Curated annotation (Swiss-Prot):
Residue ranges, annotated region (Disordered): 1-25, 46-69, 156-178, 369-405
Example GO biological process: fungal-type cell wall organization
CC annotations in GO: cytoplasm
Keywords in alphabetical order: Cell wall biogenesis/degradation, Cytoplasm
Pro residues bias locations: 1-10
Compartment(s) of residence: Cytoplasm
Keyword Lipid biosynthesis included in the entry's annotation: no
Annotated source species: Saccharomyces cerevisiae (strain ATCC 204508 / S288c)
Function: Involved in cell wall composition and integrity and response to osmotic stress.
Primary localization class, coarse: cytoplasm
Protein name: Protein HLR1
């Protein structure tokens, strides 16, 4: 096989690179650091490049039965010398001050342009506040910067209480009270946590509500449903007012009716707990039954209770017979007055009936009666006779009719006034 490897760079006789097959922009050469596309002066030292294209021998080669002839190096040199000179050339040797290896410094420093000729550059509103010498600005502030004060937060271990994870269900009143005493003695280590405070407040409210509930046995576990039932019963009993026919609530929650006037005078305080109130009512019922059997004449028993639930004193009063004022005595004078008014009215009606002559009662006309008895002036028109005619011309008859109606209205007004003033 023929040797297709390129010769070493020492065999190169020219400083320029041969023309490449593809087109590459000059800017891409400048960015990559390949400045060998420029024609270097004769005084420049020899700079071997890794981008040199391989030079092939002048001997013709056969590739798959075809003869390929490569151009000679002398022809390449003559072609490059006859070509026009490029526009750009390197005036100074490139310096390498960048920390990145192989990257030369820029030929034109844009910061120098902004400092020397600031009027040529239009400042944008986004870059107005940025200083020109940004590196110096950062370096000056970096030396005089105050170190930041770091606050090391203390990581507290969560002291989880196992009682908070369990459901809120007290085993007994004694265990609940001991637990609450222990909670009061403990300091609030987790005061910053909001959830622990909320749970503690709920437990405290539950303890205060369950403390006054009647518990049958201390050792036996109680169901919270039973406690809620008893609390509802006690709240209903506290809202009820004690009446002559009141009720007694025992520990089992049943309501037993008590007939009689034995709980009329029972005095109790609303601040007393429900358990003491129920116990006092049970004791009162038993004492009432005993007293009823011993002394059936006792009318009422008065019993006072203190806030502690202890009975202060009890009294037993015997009934005494008293003369009750009857209801009719209050209206005796009213009835006597009304009866006297009615009697007087009857007497006046009888007198008027006696004064009416027989001719008018028989139905004879009024002018005949006037002719027969002209001297009689006391003529009264009968109100009950419909057949008797009324003489409108006679003034005497109209005045008598008005007097009679006025008397009746006056009697009715007096009777009504008496009843109104008495009430």
């Amino acid at each position: 096989m023929e040797n297709l490897c390129p010769p070493p760079p020492s065999q190169m006789k020219d400083f320029s690179t041969p023309p490449r097959n593809r087109h590459r922009h000059k800017r891409s050469f400048a960015i990559s650091g390949d400045f060998e596309f420029l024609k270097q002066p004769a005084s420049a030292p020899v700079l071997p490049s890794a981008y040199d294209s391989p030079t092939f021998e002048n001997t013709p080669r056969r590739v798959s039965g075809m003869s390929v002839t490569m151009p000679d190096e002398s022809q390449n040199e003559s072609a490059l010398l006859n070509s026009p000179s490029p526009r750009f050339f390197i005036s100074e040797a490139s310096t390498y001050s960048s920390p990145i290896k192989g990257v030369p410094d820029a030929i034109i420093n844009l910061d120098d342009v902004l400092i020397n000729k600031p009027k040529m550059c239009r400042s944008h509103r986004k870059t107005k506040s940025v200083p020109v010498k940004l590196d110096e600005f950062y370096s000056s502030h970096k030396c005089s910067s105050v170190p930041e004060l770091t606050i090391n937060e203390e990581i507290d271990e969560d002291d989880t209480n196992p009682q908070l994870l369990e459901p809120v269900k007290p085993l007994s009143s004694t265990s609940l009270s001991t637990d609450m005493n222990e909670d009061k003695k403990m300091t609030l280590k987790n005061a910053r946590s909001h959830n622990s405070l909320k749970i503690q407040a709920q437990k405290q409210r539950y303890y205060n509500s369950a403390r006054y509930l009647p518990l049958n046995s201390e050792d036996r576990a109680t169901d919270p449903q039973i406690l809620t039932k008893q609390s509802s019963v006690t709240s209903l009993f506290s809202s009820r007012s004690i009446t002559p026919v009141s009720c007694n609530i025992n520990n089992a929650g049943r309501i037993n009716a008590i007939s009689g006037n034995y709980l009329d005078d029972v005095l109790y305080d609303l601040d007393t707990p429900a358990t003491t109130l129920i116990q006092d009512i049970d004791n009162l019922q038993t004492s009432i039954n005993e007293r009823v059997r011993l002394s059936p004449q006792s009318s009422s028993i008065k019993k006072y209770f203190s806030k502690d639930g202890k009975s202060v004193s009890s009294f037993n009063f015997q009934s005494q017979e008293c003369d009750m004022v009857s209801f009719t005595e209050d209206f005796a004078h009213v009835t006597s007055l009304s009866s006297s008014i009615l009697d007087s009215e009857k007497q006046t009606d009888d007198e008027e009936e006696e004064s009416i002559p027989e001719e008018i009662l028989r139905g004879e006309p009024l002018h005949v009666y006037n002719e027969t008895s002209g001297s009689d002036k006391s003529v009264i028109l009968p109100t009950k006779q419909k057949s008797a005619p009324i003489n409108k011309d006679s003034k005497h008859s109209s005045t008598q009719y008005e007097e009679k109606s006025f008397k009746k209205n006056r009697k009715f007004k007096i009777f009504a006034k008496l009843f109104c003033t008495r009430k």
